[in-house]
Amino acid sequence: MRRIYPHRHLLGIEGLSRPEIVALLDAAESLFDVSRRSVRKVPTLRGKTVVNLFYEPSTRTRTSFELAGKRLSADVINISVSTSSAVKGESLLDTVQNLQAMQPDVLVIRHAASGAPHHVAAHTRAAVVNAGDGTHEHPTQALLDAFTIRRAKGRLEGLEVAICGDIVHSRVARSNAHLLTTMGARVRFAGPRTLLPIAGESLGATVYDRIEPALEGADVVMMLRVQRERLSGSFLPSTREYSRTFGLNPARLALAKPDAIVMHPGPMNRGVEIDPRVADGAQSVILDQVEAGVAVRMAVLWILAAEANEFSATGEPRPAP
């Protein structure tokens, strides 16, 4: 039986085919209701070990990966870098080689350096999942965003998606652009010129330095925070000025289609890039994104760690072909 996802790792969205993306989204759909059961657990990854190795702060991603592994019955180990040997000077490679000696099945890694998960994948037999690397990619965030959009809109192809804010530092914007354009959606980037990538068009996006034209007729509006921890110069004026010119408020949202949905990968800076009335409004699917994250990460762990040829996502043996 052909594997539904033919890759050993999930290091990025760039390069994945449309059928591979659909396979991941469909697997997440099959697992979505597990989290709504009275017993939120299936035996799919019993006997497997998942190690979460986060070199950057995280709330949603780390928690949802932990929940995803546990709801699949895997043994989940969370390593806090602040209390690990990394603070004593141990290199990423040495950390990974020591973890490999303990025979994990999956390593989930977040790191400030772009390309770090690729480096890890070259030095371990475990499957590697990129949980965000520098300003490069965040593949599971793009998958959960696509999952949320598909549930809300019934499709991805043909949609107009506006991604607004700090694009140049956003791995979320890059992964979403790769995924959405592969699936036939049209992507618009909007932000201050200092926060736009030099070659945004190379990601398949139409680029605007004002938010209003990007919002006009949009089906989906995704807001991004300004990543001040990555700023190294005078990238933007004051917070108040940024909110005035690029914040999503009810008046600006009215430029999008009446049934447009509003998204944000978090963490939100309320009153800066997004008005609380919009974040908590009827068009917001921000908490739906958070819920989708568990199902999507369950699907990724299942596909990479389990014998996907032999078992369904919920742990039942597949019928013989």
UniProtKB/Swiss-Prot annotation:
Keywords: Pyrimidine biosynthesis, Transferase
Molecular function, one GO term: amino acid binding
Broad class of enzyme this protein falls into: transferase
Known EC number: 2.1.3.2
Gene3D superfamilies hit by this protein: Aspartate/ornithine carbamoyltransferase (3.40.50.1370)
Catalysed conversion reaction: carbamoyl phosphate + L-aspartate = N-carbamoyl-L-aspartate + phosphate + H(+)
Chain positions recorded as carbamoyl phosphate binding sites: R60, T61, R110, H138, Q141, G266, P267
Entry binding sites for L-aspartate: K88, R171, R225
InterPro entries: Asp/Orn_carbamoyltranf_P-bd (IPR006132), Asp/Orn_carbamoylTrfase (IPR006130), Asp/Orn_carbamoylTrfase_sf (IPR036901), Asp_carbamoyltransf (IPR002082), Asp_carbamoyltransf_Asp/Orn-bd (IPR006131)
One Pfam short name: OTCace_N
Known pathway: Pyrimidine metabolism; UMP biosynthesis via de novo pathway; (S)-dihydroorotate from bicarbonate: step 2/3
GO biological process, alphabetically ordered: 'de novo' pyrimidine nucleobase biosynthetic process; 'de novo' UMP biosynthetic process; amino acid metabolic process
One annotated Gene Ontology cellular component of this protein: cytosol
PROSITE patterns per UniProt: CARBAMOYLTRANSFERASE
Function description: Catalyzes the condensation of carbamoyl phosphate and aspartate to form carbamoyl aspartate and inorganic phosphate, the committed step in the de novo pyrimidine nucleotide biosynthesis pathway.
Annotated NCBIfam families: asp_carb_tr, PRK00856.1
Complexes and interactors: Heterododecamer (2C3:3R2) of six catalytic PyrB chains organized as two trimers (C3), and six regulatory PyrI chains organized as three dimers (R2).
Protein family: Belongs to the aspartate/ornithine carbamoyltransferase superfamily. ATCase family.
HAMAP family (UniProt xref): Asp_carb_tr
Protein name (record): Aspartate carbamoyltransferase catalytic subunit
UniProt organism field: Sorangium cellulosum (strain So ce56)
Source taxonomy: Bacteria, Pseudomonadati, Myxococcota, Polyangia, Polyangiales
